[in-house]
């Protein structure tokens, strides 16, 4: 029986230009793939889901990846509760930019750890891959966060990425509300790798969604 309490989660999708942030977001919200590349300045989407028997209202902010919009980043970083750090497995530069985004988030939040998931997108383009899965796992391990590879085009692990970020936020909030428990959050890294499901599947997901 799902809880009737509606909790809103402010999720922010961050990454360089052209890595597929909008495609991931629209695939989650509207269940279709956008072929054309139209650089985003800032778009916000809302969707109601049930994740692990708890109702969640996802407020997803799709952000600009272009450098000329970098001044806007700190504003949405202040309000975000969790971040998907997205790079393309076909772009070494986009992978290297992830470190900068992560450091900026921690600086703005003034935290040593904050709910983040590293996302290697476009895993359907394996023949064009220039960033190995092991490199993504290693970076996530360095951050003390989870790692997942996705494909917006093939709908691989799209829901998993967003749902697991909600789970990380819940875990983080629980840890912060109980500081006398197991110690400082982030002392142990979560499992850094999640299984990549087949197209159309939602491995590990316990949820259903309603577009708002």
UniProtKB/Swiss-Prot annotation:
User: What does the record give as EC number?
Assistant: 3.6.5.2
Keyword presence, Nucleotide-binding: yes
Q: Output the CDD domains linked to this UniProt entry.
A: H_N_K_Ras_like
Where in this protein would one find the motif Effector region, according to its record?
Answer: 37-45
What is its subcellular localisation? Cell membrane
Q: Which InterPro entries match?
A: P-loop_NTPase (IPR027417), Small_GTP-bd (IPR005225), Small_GTPase (IPR001806), Small_GTPase_Ras-type (IPR020849)
Which residues are involved in binding GTP?
Answer: 15-22, 62-66, 121-124
Membrane as a keyword?
A: yes
GO MF terms here are: G protein activity; GDP binding; GTP binding; GTPase activity
Task: Name the reaction it catalyses.
Answer: GTP + H2O = GDP + phosphate + H(+)
Tell me the residues on which Cysteine methyl ester occurs: 209
Notes on how activity is controlled = Alternates between an inactive form bound to GDP and an active form bound to GTP. Activated by a guanine nucleotide-exchange factor (GEF) and inactivated by a GTPase-activating protein (GAP).
Q: Tell me, which GO biological process terms does this entry list?
A: conidium formation; regulation of conidium formation; signal transduction; spore germination
Propeptide at which positions? Answer: 210-212
Q: How would you describe this protein's topology in the membrane? A: Lipid-anchor
Q: Please give the SUPFAM superfamilies that the UniProt record associates with this protein.
A: P-loop containing nucleoside triphosphate hydrolases
A Pfam family matched in the record: Ras
Sites of S-geranylgeranyl cysteine lipid attachment are: 209
Give the keywords, sorted.
Cell membrane, GTP-binding, Hydrolase, Lipoprotein, Membrane, Methylation, Nucleotide-binding, Palmitate, Prenylation
Record lipid sites (S-palmitoyl cysteine): 205-206
GO cellular component, alphabetical, reads: plasma membrane
Q: Per the similarity annotation, which family is this?
A: Belongs to the small GTPase superfamily. Ras family.
| PANTHER family membership | RAS, DI-RAS, AND RHEB FAMILY MEMBERS OF SMALL GTPASE SUPERFAMILY (PTHR24070)
Name of the molecule in the record = Ras-like protein
Report the source organism. Answer: Emericella nidulans (strain FGSC A4 / ATCC 38163 / CBS 112.46 / NRRL 194 / M139) (Aspergillus nidulans)
Write the lineage as a comma-separated list: Eukaryota, Fungi, Dikarya, Ascomycota, Pezizomycotina
């Amino acid at each position: 029986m799902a809880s009737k309490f509606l909790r809103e989660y402010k999720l922010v999708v961050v990454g360089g230009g052209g890595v597929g942030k909008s495609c991931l977001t629209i695939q989650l919200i509207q269940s279709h793939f956008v072929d054309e590349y139209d650089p985003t300045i800032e778009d916000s989407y809302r969707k109601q889901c049930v994740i692990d028997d708890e109702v969640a209202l996802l407020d997803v902010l799709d952000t600009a990846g272009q450098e000329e919009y970098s001044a806007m980043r700190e504003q949405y970083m202040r309000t975000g509760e969790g971040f998907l750090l997205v790079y393309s497995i076909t772009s070494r530069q986009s992978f290297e930019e992830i470190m900068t985004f992560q450091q900026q988030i921690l600086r703005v939040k003034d935290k040593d750890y904050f709910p983040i998931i590293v996302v290697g997108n476009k895993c359907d383009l394996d023949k064009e891959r220039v960033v190995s899965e092991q490199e993504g796992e290693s970076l996530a391990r360095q951050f003390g966060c989870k790692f997942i590879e996705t494909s917006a085009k093939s709908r691989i692990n799209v829901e998993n990425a967003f749902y697991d970020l909600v789970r990380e936020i819940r875990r983080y909030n629980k840890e912060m509300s109980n500081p006398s428990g197991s110690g400082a959050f982030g002392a142990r890294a979560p499992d850094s790798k999640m299984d990549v499901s087949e197209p159309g599947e939602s491995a590990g997901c316990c949820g259903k969604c309603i577009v708002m």
